[in-house]
Regions:
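Secretory/export targeting leaders with adjacent low-complexity proregions
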Residues: 2-229
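Hydrophobic alpha-helical bundle architecture
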Residues: 231-240
Length: 241
């Protein structure tokens, strides 16, 4: 029922309510079906099945895995935990329907563009808004890109954090920047190899991280509902797409 979902409807005569009811009906069918054949039979009997237009309007669809990483962290800074993740600032403006960032609300009520990631980092703009600290800038950046994480705190507790908004600056992938810099080839690009590059020369990788001007904010999540997909429902390992 989120506005970001309703904005896409109606489409091809299908209302948001119909789409919502269909998802719930398929969920019930999955629970009640005793065999694969029973599920497929009732699916064909009771549903109209559409092929996605894809991102190119020609049926091309990309399915990706949902990454739910663990990181070590602390609610207080230290020599080990020195890379902060920040809560959403009160002057962040977003579109109420889509959730997309609009900019920064100024004192006169106007909206301007946020500073870049590098400018934010150098100015310590969000000092006092820290939610938690992780071990280094690459861990923090990885969580920025992923949008959520499970944190193993130094006191032994678990903390779950997730996306709470971002600035209106453009996104540039670290992987593409590393390839352009000649540090890795396309077939060698992986988080493990990026970690090796960072451990060898963190300043070099931080410079490439700064090319991504977008900056993400976080909030603490209910661990029983983490990680949640786009529908706000907890995803299932090896099943959810």
């Amino acid at each position: 029922d989120a506005p970001s979902s309703k904005q896409w409807f109606p489409i091809e005569g299908i209302t948001h309510e119909q789409a919502k009811n269909s998802v719930m009906a398929i969920r019930d069918l999955l629970v009640s079906s005793k065999t694969k054949n029973e599920f497929l039979y009732k699916l064909e009997l009771n549903f109209d099945v559409y092929r996605s237009v894809g991102y190119d309007n020609d049926g091309t669809v990309l399915f990706t895995g949902y990454y739910s990483p663990d990181f070590y962290a602390s609610t207080t800074p230290s020599k080990r935990y020195n890379a902060p993740l920040y809560t959403r600032p009160s002057d962040l403006a977003t579109d109420p329907a889509s959730g997309q960032p609009l900019g920064r609300i100024l004192s006169d009520g106007s909206i301007s563009t946020w500073p870049t990631r590098r400018e934010i980092r150098l100015s310590n703009l969000f000092n006092g808004n820290e939610l938690v600290w992780v071990e280094d800038d690459l861990d923090a950046y990885t969580i920025h890109v992923n949008g959520s994480a499970r944190l193993r705190l130094d006191n032994g507790e678990l903390m779950y954090i997730g996306y709470a908004g971002k600035t209106d600056r453009p996104y540039t992938g670290l992987g593409s920047s590393i390839i352009e810099a000649g540090l890795l080839s396309q077939n060698k690009l992986s988080l493990r190899n990026i970690r090796r590059l960072y451990d060898h020369d963190p300043d070099q990788i931080n410079t490439l991280i700064d090319r991504n001007e977008s900056f993400v904010f976080f909030q603490e999540y209910d661990g029983s509902k983490w990680p949640a997909g786009s529908l706000g429902v907890k995803v299932t390992a090896q099943r959810t797409i």
